[in-house]
């Protein structure tokens, strides 16, 4: 999910719900399956009240912590080489690509927050359809993309294009990692390279969302549920990053494309069964 906004209300009722949603967030943020869709669908499946954008932010702070801890050396190298060597090295090019690629997502998120909250977050059917559609696109990109280029061969323009794809992730069901990984595969990046670029590109946009929201937050927002959700998302997110990067050394994204289709089908079936 791409989070930019200033909504500060809305929390699960119990710490247990917060932990469950934190684990869901940690799993779904880094897998191309849409964390925002799962944070809406899981409460809907279980009959809970919607958690709201404020709690979604709390969970994204958790996954931000996971990315920062896992990639702290990479983030430090990006900052140093980006400032000292500009675009003369692969790391420098990636750094400036991330800076430029973050802009579309930030602008789109700020402009579209109210529309997304009013339209997309309220429509379970729309979320299901987007899960399926992006799943098909991910399948095609993984199945037919060249997948030849490594991180050392990346261009600034590649990261900007991936950043444009990231802008679509403000819409639940699209998936920030799904959009960015799919774009990376379509541009010819190796599977593991596409994932790493996706994770690093997400760091500033999630940080920006936290910086915008937390200073204006109601102190009542910082409940035990908030901190339980953050911790659960951080721990599960770190584990998923490590596991996915190992898996992608030999595995593909096809399983996630099929999973998206399965979740979409189950969701539509439940909608029909409930007469909604």
From Swiss-Prot:
Its main location: membrane. GO terms for molecular function: undecaprenyl-diphosphatase activity. It comes from the Bacteria. Keywords: Antibiotic resistance, Cell membrane, Cell shape, Cell wall biogenesis/degradation, Hydrolase, Membrane, Peptidoglycan synthesis, Transmembrane, Transmembrane helix. The chain crosses the membrane at residues 13-33, 52-72, 96-116, 122-142, 154-174, 197-217, 225-245, 253-273. It catalyses: di-trans,octa-cis-undecaprenyl diphosphate + H2O = di-trans,octa-cis-undecaprenyl phosphate + phosphate + H(+). One of its GO terms (biological process) is peptidoglycan biosynthetic process. One of its GO terms (cellular component) is plasma membrane. It is a multi-pass membrane protein. It is found in: Cell membrane. Its EC number is 3.6.1.27. Belongs to the UppP family. Bacitracin is thought to be involved in the inhibition of peptidoglycan synthesis by sequestering undecaprenyl diphosphate, thereby reducing the pool of lipid carrier available. Catalyzes the dephosphorylation of undecaprenyl diphosphate (UPP). Confers resistance to bacitracin. This is Undecaprenyl-diphosphatase. It comes from Symbiobacterium thermophilum (strain DSM 24528 / JCM 14929 / IAM 14863 / T).
């Amino acid at each position: 999910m791409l989070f930019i906004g200033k909504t500060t209300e809305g929390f699960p009722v119990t710490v247990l719900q917060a932990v469950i949603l934190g684990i869901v967030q940690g799993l779904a943020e880094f897998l191309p399956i849409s964390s925002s869709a799962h944070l809406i669908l899981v409460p809907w499946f279980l009959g809970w009240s919607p958690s709201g954008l404020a709690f979604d932010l709390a969970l994204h702070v958790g996954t931000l912590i996971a990315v920062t801890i896992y990639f702290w050396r990479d983030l430090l190298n990006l900052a140093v080489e980006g400032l000292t060597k500009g675009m003369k090295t692969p790391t420098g090019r990636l750094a400036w690509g991330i800076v430029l690629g973050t802009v579309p997502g930030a602008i789109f998120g700020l402009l579209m927050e109210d529309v997304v909250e009013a339209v997309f977050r309220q429509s379970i059917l729309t979320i299901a359809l987007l899960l399926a559609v992006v799943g098909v696109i991910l399948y095609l990109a993984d199945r037919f993309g060249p997948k030849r280029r490594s991180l050392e061969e990346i261009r600034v323009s590649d990261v900007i294009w991936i950043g444009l794809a990231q802008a679509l992730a403000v819409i639940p069901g699209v998936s920030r990692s799904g959009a960015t990984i799919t774009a990376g595969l379509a541009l010819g990046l190796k599977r593991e390279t596409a994932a790493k670029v996706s994770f690093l590109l997400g760091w500033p946009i999630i940080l920006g969302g936290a910086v915008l929201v937390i200073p204006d937050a109601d102190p009542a927002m910082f409940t035990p549920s908030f901190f339980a959700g953050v911790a659960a998302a951080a721990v599960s997110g770190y584990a998923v990053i490590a596991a996915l990067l190992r898996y992608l050394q030999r595995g593909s994204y096809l399983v996630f494309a099929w999973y998206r289709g399965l979740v979409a089908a189950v969701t539509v079936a439940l909608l029909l069964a409930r007469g909604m």
